């Protein structure tokens, strides 16, 4: 048996118009003594309509529309949301901790600190809301947004803040049969 010394020679391959990176190579023997090789690859993809995302609290959803950044609503400070979710999704899935993460994340973002936004943290919601008021926001984290296409003020205040979302494996490009 010839032994080949592995040298990390990560490469980029183009397959199906996608850049694919080789992260790891593993050459080993199984329990029966046969050689095997494992290759871990990763592909960079832009989100498309139908891709599935989830917050840390299990608030799942799929992309229903992709709007150019210039057309997204914006705050008085010029902050534009990356995603807009249906507010009815929070009570129906009972992901109330996501609201706590959003408000705490907004406070910590403006103060420049890190924090624990989980339900196991020692922050009380009323304390977080007080801190939000102290830095100049409404205690319920609502803000006035303006229409990105017309510049007009939206009719209602919008609950806005940072939340960590991650893409799930359910991607449209993997499910299409073309």
Residue positions per predicted region:
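Intrinsically disordered, low-complexity regulatory segments
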Residues: 1-178
């Amino acid at each position: 048996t010839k032994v080949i010394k592995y040298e990390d020679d990560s490469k980029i391959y183009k397959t199906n118009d996608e850049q694919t990176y080789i992260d790891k190579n593993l050459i080993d023997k199984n329990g029966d003594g046969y050689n095997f090789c494992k290759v871990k690859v990763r592909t960079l993809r832009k989100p498309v309509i139908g891709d599935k995302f989830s917050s840390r609290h299990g608030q799942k959803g799929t992309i229903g529309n992709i709007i150019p950044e210039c057309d997204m609503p914006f705050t008085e400070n010029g902050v534009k949301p990356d995603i807009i979710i249906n507010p009815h999704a929070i009570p129906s899935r009972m992901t109330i901790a996501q609201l706590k993460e959003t408000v705490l994340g907004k406070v910590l973002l403006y103060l420049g600190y890190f924090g624990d936004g989980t339900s196991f943290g020692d922050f009380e919601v009323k304390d977080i809301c007080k801190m939000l008021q102290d830095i100049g926001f409404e205690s319920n984290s609502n803000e006035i947004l303006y229409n990105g296409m017309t510049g007009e003020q939206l009719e209602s205040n919008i609950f806005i803040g940072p939340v960590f979302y991650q893409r799930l494996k359910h991607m449209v490009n993997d499910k299409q049969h073309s």
